[in-house]
Amino acid sequence: MSGSVLFTAGERWRCFLTPSRSSLYWALHNFCCRKKSTTPKKITPNVTFCDENAKEPENALDKLFSSEQQASILHVLNTASTKELEAFRLLRGRRSINIVEHRENFGPFQNLESLMNVPLFKYKSTVQVCNSILCPKTGREKRKSPENRFLRKLLKPDIERERLKAVNSIISIVFGTRRIAWAHLDRKLTVLDWQQSDRWSLMRGIYSSSVYLEEISSIISKMPKADFYVLEKTGLSIQNSSLFPILLHFHIMEAMLYALLNKTFAQDGQHQVLSMNRNAVGKHFELMIGDSRTSGKELVKQFLFDSILKADPRVFFPSDKIVHYRQMFLSTELQRVEELYDSLLQAIAFYELAVFDSQP
């Protein structure tokens, strides 16, 4: 094991590496959680410096953080490697690389204001980064919450609860071997768009990357913008070799959708594409028999009728689109287009489980 020394306001703390975290990470966690100093100097608490929406006056960051806090933040920014910086969630991806490159090209950071000279750092994001460096949340603290445990089982990758609470619209996407379907719903559970496409030539012959790109790009071009794009995550076993062609197709589709729909990930490191557990949706709507999920066709049919007959339906279809959606549904009755039904059910479950109430 190796040690890391953190110098702050004339004092000296030492914390040792653990197998799963960097020394800088735990050193700053100890800094945040240690007992208050007995010195007369007052350290500004988090509740006062955490105003991330404040306007940017001159030397704003110096006024938000005490000299002791500034020294701790600068210590991390000037000494941590790219890997150590990525221990802080807000510094994952390109941001950590940009910090190290800026440090190598222009020397150590002299003050917090200079961090805003680094690409991808604006005033608000700089305040967020400084706060996260001072008081990072440990994995143990996150695991204590039953809410977080449930969300980790429901959605991948992990998403902050605040982002889920603030969502205004999502596009739920379900694809199979022959077709893809999507449903666009806002937080009032109004169906803004609901479509399917089965005119593709995937899984015919070789698995050509260029063909997948062309087909999926064409489909995505028809989708409106949304806060999140939610993909269905199936539980097919890799142990069954006969399912390998289907698994390969699913993984290619998933990778393409993650790459094409996560348009700002390289800049801000924020995921917009999520994968949602298929069986969790089935359990939510009581469609599971053992480990198998039954068709949601009749449930979707009932939702369509309820939207017309009930004053407060579970999901709302706009009056100018309800006829079109009913005709689309009726045209699939002989084919049993499960992707179409499942895309709508997944969207409803996302709001009811992850946005409105995170407990089943």
Swiss-Prot record:
Q: Where is the transit peptide?
A: 1-35
Tell me if Phosphoprotein is a UniProt keyword of this record.
no
Q: Where in the cell is it found?
A: Mitochondrion matrix; Mitochondrion matrix, Mitochondrion nucleoid
Descriptive protein name: Transcription elongation factor, mitochondrial
Name the source organism. Answer: Homo sapiens
Just give the chief location class.
mitochondrion
The entry's cellular-component GO terms read:
mitochondrial matrix; mitochondrial nucleoid; mitochondrion; ribonucleoprotein complex
Q: Does the keyword Transcription regulation apply?
A: yes
* Disease linkage: Combined oxidative phosphorylation deficiency 58: An autosomal recessive mitochondrial disease manifesting in the first 5 years of life and characterized by a wide range of clinical presentations. Clinical features include neonatal lactic acidosis, epileptic encephalopathy, developmental delay and impaired intellectual development with non-specific brain abnormalities, or mitochondrial myopathy with a treatable neuromuscular transmission defect.
Record key words, sorted: Disease variant, Mitochondrion, Mitochondrion nucleoid, Primary mitochondrial disease, Transcription, Transcription regulation, Transit peptide
- Spell out the subunit comment: Interacts with POLRMT.
Q: Which gene produces this protein? A: TEFM
